[in-house]
Structure formats: C-alpha cells, structure tokens
C-alpha cells in the first residue's frame, strides 16, 4: 500500500539520519555531525544561489578549509554537486562563489524539515531549479554526453542557471517555476 504523508516524512528523516549523518561521517572519519547538519542546512536554503564559504564557515564557527573538506566529502558521497561560475570577462562577470545542488530534493527537504505540499511552499523556485539541474545531469550521464558545467552571472545581476561547454560549443538553460523575471 502507498505510504501516508507521515510515513513518507518518516522515511526521509530516517534516510537523512542514517545515510547522511552516520554513513557519510563514518566514511570520512568525521566526528562533527552537528557541523555537517549545519552546513547541509545552509546549503539547502541556498540551493541555486551562490554560496560564500566564508559565510558558511562563520555561521558554523569553523575555518574555511574545514568547510571545503566537508563539501568535498558531500560531493564524493553523492549528496551535493557544485557548479562553478563561467566567465570570459572577469571584470563584469561573477565567478568566485559556487552554487550547490542536492542530488535528491527529498534529502534536501528532510534536512530542513520542509514537507509541505508544493502550493504551500515559498521555496518552489529553488526546488524546481534543483530538480531540473539534477535531471539534466542524470540525462547527460545516462547518454554519456560529457561537458563542463557552469552558471553565468554578471555583477548587474543578469544570470543563466546552467551553461554547458562541450568542445567549445555553449548551451544555456534558465530554470523558472513562474513567468516572473528577477
């Protein structure tokens, strides 16, 4: 039988607590589950946005190198994937901060304890962007189509969510839940 909403939430919570907080920590011989949880929450609330590692480090009260180590661990454990900035003109384009996406929106929701239905959520745009980015990644992996992936943003706030560079040929994607433009 189909699990109830409460049953689904319980499954996600168990996944987050067992897979993320036990397996990932054991894998890297890391002791700080509170630190890992805090970093994951910060990333979850910033999906699709550029993330300042200095801000994350200050928020969790650790040094930037430790944050980088945790992020590397989370990427190797297939929890998150990073996206660097694309630039051909460093004076007008932002490249210093990466974006992070979760390979599973359910895990993201479990981390921040957000299980409301779509029409009751204020983060639907972030969920949509995360979903489409990951589906694109899975599709290209399945088809063995490899390219460098970036986002593009100018200091005047113009942005493209995903730029794929394959053999010098660029392809751009913008993910919007609603027709409203930023």
Question: For the regions a protein language model found, what residue spans apply to each?
Answer:
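A short alpha-helical element within helix-turn-helix/winged-helix DNA-binding domains
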Residues: 50, 55-58
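Interdomain motor-coupling "hinge/lid" segment immediately C-terminal to the ATP-binding subdomain
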Residues: 1-45, 49-50
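Conserved short-loop catalytic and cofactor-binding motifs
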Residues: 27, 55, 120
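A cross-kingdom feature that marks ATP-driven nucleic-acid transaction machinery
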Residues: 69-79, 83-182
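Residues in the helix-turn-helix
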Residues: 66
């Amino acid at each position: 039988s189909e699990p109830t909403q409460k049953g689904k939430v319980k499954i996600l919570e168990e996944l987050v607590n067992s897979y993320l907080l036990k397996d990932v920590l054991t894998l890297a011989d890391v002791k700080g589950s509170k630190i890992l949880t805090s970093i994951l929450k910060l990333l979850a609330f910033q999906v699709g946005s550029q993330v300042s590692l200095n801000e994350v480090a200050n928020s969790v009260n650790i040094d930037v190198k430790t944050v980088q180590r945790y992020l590397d661990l989370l990427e190797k454990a297939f929890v998150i994937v990073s996206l660097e900035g694309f630039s051909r003109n460093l004076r007008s384009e932002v490249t210093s901060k990466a974006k992070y996406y979760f390979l599973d929106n359910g895990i993201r929701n479990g981390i921040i304890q957000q299980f409301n239905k779509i029409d009751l959520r204020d983060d639907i745009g972030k969920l949509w962007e995360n979903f489409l980015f990951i589906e694109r990644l899975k599709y290209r992996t399945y088809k063995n189509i490899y390219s460098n992936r970036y986002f593009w943003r100018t200091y005047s706030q113009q942005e493209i969510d995903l730029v794929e560079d394959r053999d010098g040929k660029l392809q751009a994607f913008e993910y919007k839940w609603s027709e409203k433009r930023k």
